[in-house]
Curated annotation (Swiss-Prot):
Belongs to the archaeal/bacterial/fungal opsin family. It is found in: Cell membrane. Pfam families: Bac_rhodopsin. GO terms for cellular component: plasma membrane. Residues 72-77, 148-150, 201-212, 276-297 are cytoplasmic. Light-driven chloride pump. Residues 1-31 are annotated as: Disordered. The keyword RNA-binding does not apply. The chain crosses the membrane at residues 46-71, 78-101, 126-147, 151-174, 178-200, 213-236, 247-275. This is Halorhodopsin. It comes from Haloterrigena sp. (strain arg-4). Residues 1-45, 102-125, 175-177, 237-246 are extracellular. The keyword Mitochondrion does not apply.
């Protein structure tokens, strides 16, 4: 499944003696297409894996339509910011799961020595990490605007969240060393601690002052509990200790977590925003640097 491409223009030229290497470049592109088709076929023939992806495609598409309807009457600026961030969650998920089911953002990687599946090719759904890099900041953005969090605090937490996702991707794709996989995992966990600290210790105070403490508390615990499931599943699944050595079962685990952490979260938030727009519009504070608020001199 490996291919080489040649990009040296001094080799790929119009002359007959240089034609062979240019043909290799074309063949490499063909090999990439074949590789993608093979991955898509592997996904399609694995019932557990295939169904875990299509369920989310269907739910993401349905959620987009339902959420647009729920938010149809929202007019206040801050409320619309929350709605916009929330709508991005299923939109990103739909794109992601389409990439996974077609094999575009998935592929086999060989597990390193000392791994339980050392030497075996395991299908990596690395596209999930790209999804989380885009969708989880939207969740935090919506929560931050709901709680009227200071812009600087919001930036730091979202930056930590992105770092968490990207180092998680590095952990999943590292094949040179089993120890380095876990090193990236620990760095990702450290970033996660920053996010948890904000959600559990800092932002609740902001939410109480903004008059959104009740709904923030519900969404905070939903987010914290479900997000904790991702690193636990990584450790137990094929990417970690392989105690669950089925890619299909691992994929279903991630998909179920996504359903709760994204669609359920978004539905609860949008319903509250639509019914409590005045609370968000008026707020309890101003001039604290939160996006959407006027800054007082």
């Amino acid at each position: 499944m490996r291919s080489r491409t040649y990009h040296d223009q001094s080799v790929c030229g119009p002359y007959g003696s240089q034609r062979t290497d240019c043909d290799r470049d074309t063949d490499a592109g063909s090999d990439t297409d074949v590789h993608g088709a093979q991955v898509a076929t592997q996904i399609r023939t694995d019932t557990l894996l295939h169904s875990s992806l299509w369920v989310n495609i269907a739910l993401a598409g349905l959620s987009i339509l339902v959420f647009l309807y729920m938010a149809r009457t929202v007019r206040a600026n801050r409320a619309r910011l929350i709605v916009g961030a929330t709508l991005m969650i299923p939109l990103v998920s739909l794109s992601s799961y389409l990439g996974l089911v077609t094999g575009l953002t998935a592929g086999p990687i060989e597990m390193p020595a000392a791994h339980a599946l050392a030497g075996e090719d395991v299908l990596s759904q690395w596209g999930r990490y790209l999804t989380w890099t885009l969708s989880t900041p939207m969740i935090l953005l919506a929560l931050g605007w709901l709680a009227e969090v200071d812009t600087a605090d919001l930036f730091v937490v979202i930056a930590a969240d992105i770092g968490m996702c990207l180092t998680g991707l590095a952990a999943a794709l590292t094949t040179s060393s089993y120890a380095f996989r876990w090193a990236f995992y620990l760095v990702s966990t450290a970033f996660f601690v920053v996010v948890l600290y904000a959600l559990l210790a800092k932002w609740p105070t902001n939410a109480e002052a903004a008059g959104t403490g009740d709904i923030f508390g519900t969404l905070r615990w939903l987010t914290v509990i479900l997000w904790l499931g991702y690193p636990i599943l990584w450790a137990l699944g094929v990417e970690g200790f392989a105690l669950v050595d089925s890619v299909g079962l691992t994929s279903w685990g991630y998909s179920l977590l996504d359903i709760g952490a994204k669609y359920l979260f978004a539905a609860l938030l949008l319903r509250w925003v639509a019914n409590n727009e005045r609370t968000i519009a008026v707020g309890q504070r101003s001039g604290r640097g939160a996006i959407g608020d006027p800054v007082e001199d």
